C-alpha cells in the first residue's frame, strides 16, 4: 500500500460530506492524485447495502445485522475501490470507515467496541487509515443542521432519538482516545471555511 488513506468521521450533521467536496479540488490543484469516496457505498454492491441500511421502514433491523451489513459493505468497497487506488499512490478521502462502526454499533447500539472491532478486523484484514479526522459536534447542533438541509434525504439513523445520537458522540470520543495515534479531533461547530483550512493544515502537516 503506497498511497495515503484519510478518513473523515463524525456524528450526523457534522459536515463530513461538505468538507470532502472542498478537500477534493484543493488537493487536485496541488497535482495530487486524489479520490473521494464514502461508506457505506462507493461501489455498486456497497451502495445497494447502503440503501438497505438507510431505509426508514427497516426499523426492525437488529443491531448485529446492522453491524454485519456495514462490515460487508466495507469489505467490498475496500478491495474493489480503496486498495487499488492506494496501490496507485492515490490520496483517498473516505467519508466514514471502521470508527463509525465502533461508535454507532459498538457503543451506541451496545454491542461492545471490542466485538465490533474484531468483525471489522476480519473485514478489512487490518487495513487502517493513515489519518482520521473526527469532526466533533453536539448532537443537537448536528441534527438541527440536517433539518435545515432540504437537499439531504433523512435516513433510518437520523430518525433515532436524541439519546442515541448522544451515545454516538460518547462512543466517538472513546474511539478518539483509544486511537489517538491516528485520530485528530476537530471542532465542527465553526464556519466551513475555517474548518476546511484547519483540516487541510492537519493533512499536509501529518502526511504530505
UniProtKB/Swiss-Prot annotation:
It is an enzyme of class 2 (transferase). Belongs to the thymidylate kinase family. ATP binds at residues 10-17. The keyword Chaperone does not apply. It holds the Pfam family Thymidylate_kin. Phosphorylation of dTMP to form dTDP in both de novo and salvage pathways of dTTP synthesis. GO terms for cellular component: cytosol. Its EC number is 2.7.4.9. One of its GO terms (molecular function) is dTMP kinase activity. This is Thymidylate kinase. Keywords: ATP-binding, Kinase, Nucleotide biosynthesis, Nucleotide-binding, Transferase. HAMAP family: Thymidylate_kinase. It catalyses: dTMP + ATP = dTDP + ADP. One of its GO terms (biological process) is dTTP biosynthetic process. The keyword Nucleotide-binding applies. The gene is tmk. PROSITE patterns: THYMIDYLATE_KINASE.
Amino acid at each position: 500500500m503506497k498511497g495515503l488513506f484519510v478518513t473523515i468521521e463524525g456524528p450526523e450533521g457534522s459536515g463530513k460530506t461538505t468538507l470532502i467536496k472542498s478537500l477534493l479540488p484543493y488537493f487536485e490543484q496541488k497535482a495530487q492524485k486524489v479520490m473521494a469516496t464514502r461508506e457505506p457505498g462507493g461501489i455498486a454492491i456497497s451502495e445497494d447495502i447502503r440503501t438497505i441500511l438507510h431505509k426508514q421502514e427497516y426499523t426492525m433491523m437488529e443491531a448485529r445485522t446492522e453491524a454485519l451489513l456495514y462490515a460487508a459493505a466495507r469489505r467490498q468497497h475496500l478491495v474493489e475501490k480503496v486498495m487499488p487506488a492506494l496501490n496507485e499512490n492515490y490520496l483517498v478521502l473516505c467519508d466514514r470507515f471502521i470508527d463509525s462502526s465502533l461508535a454507532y454499533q459498538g457503543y451506541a447500539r451496545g454491542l461492545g467496541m471490542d466485538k465490533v472491532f474484531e468483525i471489522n478486523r476480519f473485514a478489512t484484514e487490518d487495513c487502517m487509515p493513515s489519518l482520521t479526522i473526527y469532526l466533533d459536534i453536539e448532537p443537537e447542533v448536528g441534527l438541527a443542521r440536517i433539518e435545515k438541509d432540504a437537499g439531504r434525504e433523512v435516513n433510518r439513523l437520523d430518525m433515532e432519538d436524541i439519546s442515541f445520537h448522544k451515545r454516538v458522540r460518547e462512543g466517538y470520543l472513546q474511539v478518539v482516545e483509544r486511537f489517538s495515534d491516528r485520530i485528530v479531533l476537530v471542532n465542527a461547530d465553526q464556519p466551513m471555511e475555517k474548518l476546511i483550512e484547519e483540516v487541510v493544515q492537519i493533512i499536509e502537516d501529518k502526511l504530505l
